[in-house]
Amino acid sequence: MNIYLKGNIKRLMLFLILTLALVCKTKPEDKYIWYSPREVISNADKLQPGDILILSKRPTLRSMWGHAAVLNEHKKIVEFPSYSAGYSESPIYAWQNINRKVAIFRLKGIDDKFKSVLFKEINETITKPYGLTFHKNFDKRLYCSQFVYLVFKKAGEKTGREVNLDSNGGGWVMPFDIMDSDLLENISLY
């Protein structure tokens, strides 16, 4: 490979990294109610199955987008946290030492029928691997916020309700896209 081509590739990579860093900082976090993981754990009785948990962004490659998870019918955190884990289910207290803030969201008008279908959709994802995809509706492998988006969307389709949690309609769905959805309310624990 010639020197000219190597230099252009380096510039392109630097441009892409800087663009991604800028994009991940475009949503203000201060318009939401945030809690420490310990506050969430100590107020777990106020959480409901079907609640969406969003972790705040951090200035690292792995966490610069935030993170999304949902509570199943047993109020356990279900998520797609990484390539090595794929689907993961853990008690709420498993997040007690995470050094990030947590925002809690609930689908407006959620009822028992919707929750029942939602939990079936969650259970159908157990064997799917983690993976980044370039289209949010591709469900052969999933990343955290795509998982949340798809289980709510499919539950909505099966209950006759349109539930599109992607607030900006892009090809990907990120945690902060979900947070901005008009279909959700940010839950206060106090």
Task: Describe the predicted segments one by one.
Residues 1-48:
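Protein maturation boundaries and topogenic segments
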Residues 25-32, 134-190:
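Activation targets extended, charge/polar-rich intrinsically disordered C-terminal tails
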Residues 39-45, 57-63, 110-117, 135-144, ...:
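Extracytoplasmic/periplasmic, Sec-exported soluble proteins
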Residues 45-51, 116, 120, 124, ...:
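Solvent-exposed, polar/charged alpha-helical surfaces in well-ordered, non-transmembrane soluble domains
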Residues 47-108, 130-139:
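Glycine-rich catalytic cores of cysteine/serine-nucleophile enzymes that process amide/ester linkages
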Residues 77, 108-127:
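A structural motif
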Residues 82, 123-127, 149-157:
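Sec-exported extracytoplasmic/periplasmic mature domains
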